[in-house]
Design a protein with these regions (language model features):
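Short acidic-hydrophobic, aromatic-tinged amphipathic segments that line or gate anion-handling sites
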Residues: 529-545
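Conserved SAM-binding loop
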Residues: 76, 510, 535
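Short secondary-structure boundary/hinge segments and terminal tails
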Residues: 291, 332, 519, 538-539
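Short, contiguous clusters of charged residues that form electrostatic/catalytic patches at enzyme active sites
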Residues: 29, 187, 191, 462, ...
Length: 555
């Protein structure tokens, strides 16, 4: 039962001290965030290859459950730009039915991640990988909008990055300059509107202005209504047809959705923690994300996760409890019921412009450039490779390869800093220098002392075989206070050293063995082999033990 307290939604704990004043702030913030989410939800749905209302279904259903069950006070859930390229690719290959099954499976995976406390493992994904795949996704989003932004007369846009570029190049002569002008106007409005008001999103103003201009002047610009039939009304429950072959086929896409949802939602939660001074429950958040995606799929939605920009807007506008996220969902529901038909007049180039700005903002190119200038070459290599794999292949391959590469490079660095040092012995003429040698001890003449620095693991095991046993010595002390961890390869090195010492008539003494290496030795029976009396708590005890052995030998 104790472990399940980490899954308790934040809503249930914050409501104990809930006030009318905070309720009013949450309602106002929820309304503002809904206004921000409206154009984004529609634009992201269309860019993903589904109907506009499906973006709102996602923001309403997933957004509600992510707030209601989540481990963050202020998380706002819904469709995000990070999923656009992934969803588009899934639909192109497996259809909407495949996307629904993948989203259901991803929801189940996220719930299991939360139940098994995987939320704490996300922190082990290096920042270079998250920056790399985020930049790759952002680039894919921007490139995916070129058709609608330029008004190109062409068929369906290929899912692959290279295929998109080739298709655009073949159809570049069909550009519509009126459509381009509307798109540029939408971008300019989004760039400069924040100087007028930061409360009302520039994307909403861009939609209102461009829709008005296209309708009044009857401009030859394609609108949502030209391409989609928009449905107003409540989403209907639909149970997809599921077969074993389809489940097996959708396992990788589902895993991609689950991993990305977990990473983005927990990153958003961490950002909001920094803004509010609170602390989220990562495993409860994963369970909420799973339930949100599961329910979204059953009611015609698409994958969802925590949206960093909308969550930040929630905090800035006074939202401090999950009530704000729930108000945001109910507000979007009212818009869906009563205002959705008017969305058919929105120009496609305006939506493309909105997503181009979203892609630009999420790219984090400034952070990327700073890292390229300051980070080690190995980190830059991980970033660039992850970016390219995301762009030209897919997110799972990028993360898997990036993690393996980052792990190998880390092990290489750990191996490079590992070393063995033999203690230096000073003569009586060097007494004036003794005070500077903090670790300098009296060492019996029968003893030779080595000190190991670094992890004693397979990548550095060969470094620790360079021991000289010395002539006329009968005791070898290995000081291990700077060995934090050891694996089976490191243990085998110690066993080889012990075997060599026994053949040469030397006693091996280990000094200051840390907890983890001691546990490995005990489990493998090495402590019995070396003798418990030859494992000493510190170097002083080791030297004292060596001196006694020397006296015994003389006697």
């Amino acid at each position: 039962m104790n472990s399940f307290k980490y899954l308790k939604p934040k809503l249930f704990s914050v409501m104990k001290n809930y006030t009318k004043e905070q309720c009013l702030k949450d309602i106002i913030s929820g309304l503002i965030v809904a206004v921000i989410a409206l154009p984004l939800s529609i634009a992201l749905a269309i860019a993903s290859g589904v109907n506009p209302e499906q973006g709102l279904y996602t923001a309403i259903i997933a957004g509600f459950f992510i707030s209601f069950l989540g481990g963050s006070r202020v998380q706002i859930g819904g469709p995000t730009a990070a999923f656009v390229v992934i969803i588009y690719g899934i639909i192109a290959e497996h259809g909407v039915a495949g996307l629904t099954v993948a989203t259901l499976m991803a929801g189940g995976m996220l719930i299991l991640m939360g139940l098994f406390h995987f939320g704490d493992l996300i922190k082990f994904i290096p920042k270079t990988i998250t920056i790399g795949f985020t930049l790759g996704i952002a680039m894919g989003i921007v490139v995916g909008q070129i058709k609608d932004f330029l008004g190109l007369s062409m068929g369906a846009v290929p899912a692959e990055f290279v295929g998109k570029i080739v298709a655009y190049a073949h159809n570049i002569k069909s550009i519509s300059y009126v459509t381009l002008a509307v798109g540029i106007l939408a971008i300019l409005i989004q760039v400069f509107w924040p100087k007028v008001s930061k409360k009302i999103p520039g994307s909403l103003i861009a939609i209102l202005v461009t829709t008005f201009l296209v309708a009044i002047f009857k401009l030859p610009v394609k609108t949502i209504g030209d391409l989609y039939t928009i449905k107003a009304g409540l989403p209907s429950f639909t149970m997809p047809t599921i077969s074993f072959s389809l489940v097996r086929e959708m396992m990788l896409p589902a895993f991609t959705i689950a991993v990305l949802a977990a990473i983005e939602s927990l990153l958003s939660a961490v950002v909001s923690d920094g803004m509010t001074g609170s602390k989220h429950k990562s495993n409860a958040e994963l369970v909420a994300q799973g339930v949100g995606n599961f329910m979204s799929a059953l009611f015609g939605g698409i994958p969802a996760t925590g949206a960093i920009a909308r969550t930040a807007a929630n905090v800035k506008n006074g939202g401090r409890t999950p009530v704000a996220g729930m108000v945001h969902a109910f507000t979007l529901l009212l818009i869906l019921l009563f205002l959705m038909p008017y969305a058919s007049y929105i120009p496609m180039s305006c939506l493309a412009a909105i997503l181009i700005i979203v892609g630009y903002n999420m790219s984090g190119w400034r952070t990327c450039m700073r890292m390229v200038k300051t980070a080690p070459n190995s980190d830059i290599a991980v970033l660039v490779i992850t970016f390219l794999l995301t762009l030209f292949f897919d997110l799972v391959i990028a993360i898997e390869f990036g993690m393996v590469l980052a792990a190998f490079l880390f092990l290489k660095r750990m191996s490079d800093i590992a070393e063995v040092r033999q203690w230096t012995y000073k003569g009586s003429s060097d007494d004036d220098k003794l005070s500077e040698e903090v670790d300098l001890k009296y060492v019996p003449k029968n003893t030779i002392v080595y000190e190991i620095f670094g992890a004693l693991f397979f990548g550095a095991a060969n470094v620790f075989t360079n021991f000289e046993h010395g002539e006329g010595k009968n005791v070898l002390i290995i000081r291990m206070r700077n060995v934090p961890v050891m694996d089976i390869s490191g243990l085998e090195v110690l066993e080889e050293i012990l075997e060599t010492c026994q053949k040469r008539g030397l006693t091996l003494i280990l000094s200051h063995v840390n907890e983890q290496p001691y546990h490995v030795m005990g489990k493998a029976g090495f402590i019995e082999k070396i003798g418990r009396e030859n494992l000493c708590v510190n170097i002083d005890a080791s030297l004292e033990r060596a001196e006694k052995l020397g006296e015994t030998q003389k006697a």
